[in-house]
Curated annotation (Swiss-Prot):
Residues 65-137 are annotated as: Domain II. The RuvA-RuvB-RuvC complex processes Holliday junction (HJ) DNA during genetic recombination and DNA repair, while the RuvA-RuvB complex plays an important role in the rescue of blocked DNA replication forks via replication fork reversal (RFR). RuvA specifically binds to HJ cruciform DNA, conferring on it an open structure. The RuvB hexamer acts as an ATP-dependent pump, pulling dsDNA into and through the RuvAB complex. HJ branch migration allows RuvC to scan DNA until it finds its consensus sequence, where it cleaves and resolves the cruciform DNA. It is found in: Cytoplasm. This is Holliday junction branch migration complex subunit RuvA. Has three domains with a flexible linker between the domains II and III and assumes an 'L' shape. Domain III is highly mobile and contacts RuvB. One of its GO terms (cellular component) is Holliday junction resolvase complex. Homotetramer. Forms an RuvA(8)-RuvB(12)-Holliday junction (HJ) complex. HJ DNA is sandwiched between 2 RuvA tetramers; dsDNA enters through RuvA and exits via RuvB. An RuvB hexamer assembles on each DNA strand where it exits the tetramer. Each RuvB hexamer is contacted by two RuvA subunits (via domain III) on 2 adjacent RuvB subunits; this complex drives branch migration. In the full resolvosome a probable DNA-RuvA(4)-RuvB(12)-RuvC(2) complex forms which resolves the HJ. It comes from Paracidovorax citrulli (strain AAC00-1). Residues 142-190 are annotated as: Domain III.
C-alpha cells in the first residue's frame, strides 16, 4: 500500500494532481480542501494517501492531514458511500465541520453536499457517530501550549484524538514539546 507521497507537484487539475516522485508520476485524487492548500506547480508537496484497488482501476487518493485521510477511510466503509462520494463530502465541508455535523446530528448540513440525499445523510450521521476522533467536546483542552503541540504532533503522525489524549495524561505536566513527543510515542508503542 502507498501511505504517503513526497515529490514535485507537476500538474493541478481539480480534483486531480500529478506528483513526480523520483521520476514516477502519480495521479492523485484530492478533496478540494487539500487542493486549495497545495503549493504552486513545481514545488515540493507531501500527501498522505489511500490506495484503492478495484476490478477496473487502481486509484490513489491524497490528503493534506491525517484526520482528513481518517475521515475518508471511515466514510468509504459506509454502505452506499464510495471514494467519489467521500471526496465530495470532504470537498464540501472540512473534517471539523463534518465532525460537528455528526456530533450535533445535523443532517441538513450534509444534504447541502452535492450527491448526498436525506437518507444517505441520516446513514452518515448514524454510522460516523464517535468514529471521526474529532467530535466536538470529545477533546479536553490541553493544559498548556506544550501539550497542545504534542497532541498536534501525534495527530499529524496518524494517531487519533483518543490515543493522543491518553498519551498526554501519562506525561508530566511540565514536559517540553520534544521530550513530550518522545515519551508519548514510547507510551503509545506499548
Amino acid at each position: 500500500m502507498i501511505g504517503k507521497l513526497t515529490g514535485t507537484l507537476l500538474e493541478k487539475n481539480p480534483p486531480e494532481v500529478l506528483v513526480d516522485c523520483h521520476g514516477v508520476g502519480y495521479e492523485v485524487q484530492v478533496p478540494m480542501s487539500t487542493f486549495y492548500n497545495l503549493p504552486a506547480v513545481g514545488e515540493r508537496v507531501q500527501l498522505l494517501t489511500q490506495f484503492i484497488v478495484r476490478e477496473d482501476a487502481q486509484l490513489l487518493y491524497g490528503f493534506g492531514s491525517a484526520p482528513e485521510r481518517q475521515a475518508f477511510r471511515e466514510l468509504i466503509k459506509i454502505s452506499g458511500v464510495g471514494p467519489r462520494t467521500a471526496l465530495s463530502i470532504l470537498s464540501g465541508m472540512g473534517v471539523d465541520d463534518l465532525a460537528q455535523a455528526v456530533s450535533l446530528q445535523e443532517a441538513g448540513r450534509l444534504v447541502k453536499v452535492p450527491g448526498i440525499g436525506k437518507k444517505t445523510a441520516e446513514r452518515l450521521l448514524l454510522e460516523l457517530k464517535g468514529k471521526l476522533g474529532v467530535d466536538i467536546g470529545a477533546r479536553p483542552e490541553a493544559a498548556n501550549d506544550a501539550q497542545a503541540d504534542i497532541l498536534q504532533a501525534l495527530l499529524a503522525l496518524g494517531y487519533n484524538d483518543k490515543e493522543g489524549t491518553a498519551a498526554l495524561k501519562a506525561l508530566p505536566k511540565d514536559v517540553g514539546v520534544s521530550e513530550g513527543i518522545k515519551l508519548a510515542l514510547k507510551a503509545l508503542a506499548k
